Regions:
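Short S/T/G/P-rich N-terminal loop/turn motif that feeds into the first structured element of a domain
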Residues: 1-48, 52-64, 75-85
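Catalytic alpha/beta core of large soluble enzyme barrels
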Residues: 70-73
Length: 85
């Protein structure tokens, strides 16, 4: 399952880079694939992380290892579920 985590960031680029490293470590620890941090063309959000997880519970296991920083003012999670035709 692909998981998109859209969020706004009020901190510096350095702080974002440090937080991304924490996310990458949590991914390694739990086996979730960190597929990158991207700038979002969606005018609502500043950034989006892309993850590959076995399921939403697997993703939650990873995300609970990294507390949400104060610079992440709000976020949404979008799940992309594979469809077999």
């Amino acid at each position: 399952m692909k998981i998109l985590l859209y969020f706004d960031w009020t901190g510096t680029r350095k702080e974002l880079k440090e937080h991304d490293k924490k996310m990458q470590k949590a991914c390694i620890d739990t086996g979730v694939e960190h597929e990158g941090l991207f700038g979002s063309m969606n005018e609502k959000w500043n950034y989006v992380w892309l993850f590959q997880a076995n399921g939403f519970d697997h993703f939650l296991e990873m995300s609970r290892k990294v507390p949400r920083p104060i610079h992440m003012t709000h976020y949404i999670t979008e799940l992309l579920i594979p469809i077999r035709l």
